[in-house]
Amino acid sequence: MEQALENQGPAREPFNEWTLELLEELKEEAVRHFPRPWLQACGQYIYETYGDTWEGVMAIIRILQQLLFTHYRIGCQHSRIGILPSNTRGRGRRNGSSRS
């Protein structure tokens, strides 16, 4: 006969609270990188599509994560994960060879 597993590990904060904190952090970061009218239009679209639901919260989180990741990846000045321009990737050399 199977027994229910006991709660092991530290207590976690409720999912809803964690989700709202994540959304606030993403919004704060997005405001630093994107124009407010863009973000307001995105929020309005989500509200019109999903209403005031958890599905809408999850959708805006997903969109903000994708926007920020793409923004950082293509070269945000504040990011360390941006793509280097092709002319700085080896300073014109191929396969690590140097010509002197």
Swiss-Prot record:
Gene3D superfamilies: 6.10.210.10, VpR/VpX protein, C-terminal domain (1.20.5.90). Signal peptide: none annotated. Keywords: Activator, AIDS, Apoptosis, Cell cycle, Host G2/M cell cycle arrest by virus, Host nucleus, Host-virus interaction, Ion channel, Ion transport, Modulation of host cell cycle by virus, Phosphoprotein, Transcription, Transcription regulation, Transport, Viral penetration into host nucleus, Virion, Virus entry into host cell. Pfam families: VPR. The keyword Transport applies. The modification Phosphoserine is found at residues 79, 98, 100. GO terms for cellular component: host cell; host cell nucleus; host extracellular space; virion component. Residues 1-42 are annotated as: Homooligomerization. It is found in: Virion; Host nucleus; Host extracellular space. The keyword Transferase does not apply. GO terms for biological process: DNA-templated transcription; monoatomic ion transmembrane transport; protein homooligomerization; regulation of DNA-templated transcription; symbiont entry into host cell; symbiont-mediated activation of host apoptosis; symbiont-mediated arrest of host cell cycle during G2/M transition; viral penetration into host nucleus. Its main location: virion. Phosphorylated on several residues by host. These phosphorylations regulate VPR activity for the nuclear import of the HIV-1 pre-integration complex. Homooligomer, may form homodimer. Interacts with p6-gag region of the Pr55 Gag precursor protein through a (Leu-X-X)4 motif near the C-terminus of the P6gag protein. Interacts with host UNG. May interact with host RAD23A/HHR23A. Interacts with host VPRBP/DCAF1, leading to hijack the CUL4A-RBX1-DDB1-DCAF1/VPRBP complex, mediating ubiquitination of host proteins such as TERT and ZGPAT and arrest of the cell cycle in G2 phase. Belongs to the HIV-1 VPR protein family. During virus replication, may deplete host UNG protein, and incude G2-M cell cycle arrest. Acts by targeting specific host proteins for degradation by the 26S proteasome, through association with the cellular CUL4A-DDB1 E3 ligase complex by direct interaction with host VPRPB/DCAF-1. Cell cycle arrest reportedly occurs within hours of infection and is not blocked by antiviral agents, suggesting that it is initiated by the VPR carried into the virion. Additionally, VPR induces apoptosis in a cell cycle dependent manner suggesting that these two effects are mechanistically linked. During virus entry, plays a role in the transport of the viral pre-integration (PIC) complex to the host nucleus. This function is crucial for viral infection of non-dividing macrophages. May act directly at the nuclear pore complex, by binding nucleoporins phenylalanine-glycine (FG)-repeat regions. HIV-1 lineages are divided in three main groups, M (for Major), O (for Outlier), and N (for New, or Non-M, Non-O). The vast majority of strains found worldwide belong to the group M. Group O seems to be endemic to and largely confined to Cameroon and neighboring countries in West Central Africa, where these viruses represent a small minority of HIV-1 strains. The group N is represented by a limited number of isolates from Cameroonian persons. The group M is further subdivided in 9 clades or subtypes (A to D, F to H, J and K). This is Protein Vpr. It comes from Human immunodeficiency virus type 1 group O (isolate MVP5180). The lineage of its organism: Viruses, Riboviria, Pararnavirae, Artverviricota, Revtraviricetes.
